[in-house]
Each structure stands twice: as structure tokens, then as C-alpha cells.
């Protein structure tokens, strides 16, 4: 079947690769326009754009799915549109442009976590199971009927980046099987069931650690915003990113935010047991072991805020 693929970030690349290697033809790739990255703010193609170029697939780089983009997509004559984290909404008349409409690979167990940050919000909420869903795109945000779902347990130490990478691989296979079923006429989409939850895009504010919560909630927050937007706290008015942390269930309690070093472990108090800081990054410096950072802190009676 002739396809149009729309996607932008690294998480969408496995799906593009698997579809290209299948018996289907990816006739056009739609991705976001080149964006400034790095300290020099150089315009850089998206991961999907780079992969499409390597595969020899024509690309449409645009941030607006307007009339011009719709005409370009319609000219391809695709039977089906496939979206994986493109980064924009598909509206009419583009929604009806491919003969069989559009399907979307979403990294959650719909209807849970509809929105831009399903993996991050699932981890931040303390959930231990997530997954991938392939559904038919319609006007509502992630509300369409579902063709296929696969669950995946979330490891106790996995970050959002870890889980998203795993789901990108698992979801790519699920997506190809769904496209196969649609082409064969055997795929069936069923309405979503259950209470929906929303997963709005994470912001820098989501990364500020609130130590006045139990340790498991603090660790879930850190894992959920790693690598982006990143967890952080303020120590002596200096922002310190927290890349890795762990539970210390047997340690003596500390007041929320209180920092102490015991036996080489740098601990921060919560409303339950302390959390051990393993890897941190003070503002303007590279990531380092928390013990190395602590040796450079001159004030010992301090609180993380």
C-alpha cells in the first residue's frame, strides 16, 4: 500500500524504518521544518528528515499543514497516512485526503494519557505499566477508535527517555502489523473504553523537584522528566540538575529538602525516607557524581528548594 508518513523526533524513526522495509511504499515523509539547535543555533533537520534522506524518500518539511501542504500530500495519491509524533494537528481537508484516512501510533494505553507527553506523565504519576496504541485519527485529540494495543512494564529505574526508546521499537512493529491488516481488509478499530486522562506537554516548571512529598513521588518526578525537560533543585541559589537518584529506605529521616552526606552518600530529605543523589549537574558545569559536587559545596547547613 502507498503511504504518507508524518513524524519528527527520534522516537518516530523506528516506525519509518520498519515501514520502509515492509512491503508497503512510503511515498512521502512529512516532518517539521529544520530548527535551530545547539549553542550556535544552527538550523538542523529533524531525526526523521535525516533518516528519510538516507532512505531516499522525498520529504516535505513544514510546520503548517495548510492548503499547500495538503495539495502536496494529495498529489502523492497515498492510500493511507501514518503519523508518529509529527508535532502538529491534522485537520480537514487533510484528514480525509488519503483514501483510507490516517492512523496514529501513540505511546500510551489509550484512553489513558491523551496528549503530547504520555510517557512522561505516566511515569510521573507512578504508573508501572504503559504501552503503545495504534488508532484511527479523527478531529478529537487522540480520541479515535483503536486498532491495536500492546502493554509494556515500566522498570523501577527507567527514565522517560528509556521507556520512550523501548516503546518506539515495540510500537514500530505494532504499527506495521496494523498497516498490514488495513491493507488486507482485516483490521478492526474499536472505540476507546475507560476514563481518559490527559498528558499535556511538559515544561521547565515540571522539572522543579518538590521535596515536600514522599520519596517515591520525588523519584517518579525525576525519572519522568529525564532527559527532558530535566529535574532540578536550587542549592544556595544555584540551580542543580538531578540526572540520577535512588531510594534510601533504611536511612534515618531528614526534613524535606535537607541535604546531608552519610558514608559517602549525598542524601536529601523528603516526607518519607531520604533520596540519594547519584549524578547531578550544577549550573554551568558538566554532569558529575553527587559526591564530587558535595565536596565542592562550602556550606553544610543547607536545604534544597
Swiss-Prot record:
Pfam families: Formyl_trans_C, Formyl_trans_N
Cited InterPro entries: Fmt, Formyl_trans_C, Formyl_transf_N, Formyl_transf_N_sf, Formyl_transferase-like_C_sf, Met-tRNA-FMT_C, Met-tRNA-FMT_N
Binding site for (6S)-5,6,7,8-tetrahydrofolate: 108-111
GO molecular function, one term: methionyl-tRNA formyltransferase activity
GO cellular-component term (any): cytosol
Catalyzed chemical reaction(s): L-methionyl-tRNA(fMet) + (6R)-10-formyltetrahydrofolate = N-formyl-L-methionyl-tRNA(fMet) + (6S)-5,6,7,8-tetrahydrofolate + H(+)
Role according to the record: Attaches a formyl group to the free amino group of methionyl-tRNA(fMet). The formyl group appears to play a dual role in the initiator identity of N-formylmethionyl-tRNA by promoting its recognition by IF2 and preventing the misappropriation of this tRNA by the elongation apparatus.
NCBIfam families registered for this protein in UniProt: fmt
PANTHER family: METHIONYL-TRNA FORMYLTRANSFERASE, METHIONYL-TRNA FORMYLTRANSFERASE, MITOCHONDRIAL
Protein name as catalogued: Methionyl-tRNA formyltransferase
Organism: Clavibacter michiganensis subsp. michiganensis (strain NCPPB 382)
Amino acid at each position: 500500500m502507498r503511504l504518507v508518513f508524518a513524524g519528527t523526533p527520534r522516537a518516530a524513526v523506528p516506525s519509518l524504518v520498519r515501514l520502509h522495509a515492509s512491503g508497503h511504499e512510503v511515498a512521502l515523509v512529512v516532518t517539521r521544518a529544520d530548527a535551530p539547535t545547539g549553542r550556535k543555533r544552527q538550523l538542523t533537520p529533524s531525526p526523521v528528515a535525516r533518516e528519510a534522506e538516507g532512505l531516499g524518500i522525498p520529504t516535505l518539511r513544514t510546520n503548517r499543514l495548510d492548503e499547500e501542504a495538503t495539495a502536496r500530500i494529495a498529489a502523492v495519491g497515498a492510500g493511507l497516512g501514518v503519523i508518529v509524533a509529527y508535532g502538529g494537528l491534522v485537520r480537514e481537508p487533510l484528514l480525509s485526503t488519503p483514501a483510507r484516512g490516517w492512523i496514529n501510533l501513540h505511546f500510551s494505553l489509550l484512553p489513558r494519557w491523551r496528549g503530547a507527553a504520555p510517557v512522561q506523565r505516566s511515569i510521573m504519576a507512578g504508573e508501572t505499566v504503559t504501552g503503545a496504541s495504534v488508532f484511527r485519527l479523527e478531529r478529537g485529540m487522540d480520541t479515535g477508535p483503536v486498532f491495536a494495543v500492546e502493554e509494556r512494564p515500566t522498570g523501577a529505574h527507567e527514565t522517560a527517555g528509556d521507556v520512550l526508546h523501548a516503546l518506539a521499537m515495540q510500537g514500530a512493529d505494532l504499527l506495521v502489523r496494523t498497516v498490514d491488516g488495513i491493507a488486507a481488509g482485516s483490521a478492526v478499530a474499536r472505540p476507546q473504553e475507560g476514563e481518559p486522562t490527559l498528558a499535556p506537554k511538559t515544561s521547565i516548571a515540571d522539572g522543579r523537584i518538590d521535596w515536600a512529598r514522599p520519596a517515591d513521588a520525588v523519584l517518579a518526578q525525576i525519572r519522568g522528566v529525564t532527559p527532558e525537560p530535566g529535574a532540578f533543585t536550587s542549592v544556595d541559589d544555584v540551580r542543580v540538575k538531578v540526572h540520577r537518584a535512588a531510594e534510601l529506605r533504611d536511612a534515618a529521616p531528614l526534613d524535606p529538602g535537607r541535604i546531608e552526606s552519610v558514608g559517602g552518600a549525598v542524601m536529601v530529605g523528603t516526607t518519607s525516607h531520604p533520596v540519594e543523589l547519584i549524578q547531578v549537574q550544577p549550573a554551568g558545569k558538566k554532569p558529575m557524581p553527587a559526591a564530587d559536587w558535595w565536596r565542592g559545596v562550602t556550606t553544610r547547613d543547607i536545604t534544597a528548594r
